[in-house]
Structures are given as structure tokens and as C-alpha cells.
């Protein structure tokens, strides 16, 4: 629980108040996806979500995916398939993929592309698809 201006973007509460820096700042207008978190099961861009919109909701960040020192299946697939290059956008992509797979454990390529719309300057989109499909087939 934090006391601040209700219009403060959730991203800044996560990074500055909670000290969780896995959620990245990219564009600040909700387009790039580096700031993606999961709110009540939905992938959401935290830079354009006011903190007032998440009252009494479950907010998950990349840090919450690891359980008891073990990475989630999608995080492990990202490593196994050597997805990241610079890595800046990857936490947001993992969060978008996690939200998708929770709702749709066997998504089509079209559903995957519609759900993971994050921008990657390094162009790792094919590796992202391979990692997600590896989790789907496991």
C-alpha cells in the first residue's frame, strides 16, 4: 500500500516505491511493451496505467514468476532458446507470453502474435515464438 497521486503511472510505483526494476521504462506511452505486467490475469502496459486503476487488483511483475528459486517454464524456455540479445524488452515479452499461456495454453501463431505485441529493437521475434511454442509442446 502506497500513498501518492492517483494518476502516477503504475510503472513508477513498481520501480521506485516497490524497488522492482525488472519492469522497464521504454516509450512511456504504452506502445513498446517493455513495462508489461499482469493485472488480474491480463497483460497491461504499466507506463500508461494510473496506480488508481489497480486498487484491490493483483499486480504481477517479472520478479513474481520465479518460485522458490526456480524460474517459470516460460522464463526457462527464454534461456534454453537463447531469446535475449540486449534483453531490455524481454521481461515485458515474458509477461505478455505468461498472460497468454495462462488463458490459452495452446495458442495458434495468430493468437501468439496478437498477444505478444512488444517491440524488440534486436529482432528476436522468431526466437520468442520458438520459446513459447516449446512451452506449449512440453
Where are these regions (language model features)?
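Signature of N-terminal electron-transfer/Fe-S-associated modules in redox systems
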Residues: 1-138
Amino acid at each position: 500500500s502506497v500513498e501518492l497521486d492517483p494518476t502516477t503511472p503504475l510503472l513508477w510505483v513498481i520501480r521506485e516505491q516497490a524497488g522492482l526494476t525488472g519492469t522497464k521504462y521504454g516509450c512511456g506511452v504504452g506502445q513498446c511493451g517493455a513495462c508489461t505486467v499482469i493485472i488480474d490475469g491480463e497483460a497491461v502496459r504499466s507506463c500508461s496505467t494510473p496506480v488508481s486503476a489497480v486498487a484491490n487488483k493483483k499486480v504481477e511483475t517479472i520478479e513474481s514468476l520465479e518460485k522458490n528459486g526456480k524460474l517459470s517454464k516460460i522464463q526457462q524456455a527464454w534461456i534454453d532458446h537463447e531469446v535475449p540479445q540486449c534483453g531490455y524488452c524481454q521481461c515485458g515479452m515474458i509477461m505478455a507470453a505468461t498472460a497468454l499461456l495462462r488463458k490459452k495454453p495452446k495458442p495458434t501463431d495468430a493468437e501468439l502474435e496478437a498477444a505478444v505485441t512488444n517491440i524488440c529493437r534486436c529482432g528476436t521475434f522468431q526466437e520468442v515464438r520458438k520459446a513459447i511454442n516449446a512451452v506449449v509442446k512440453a
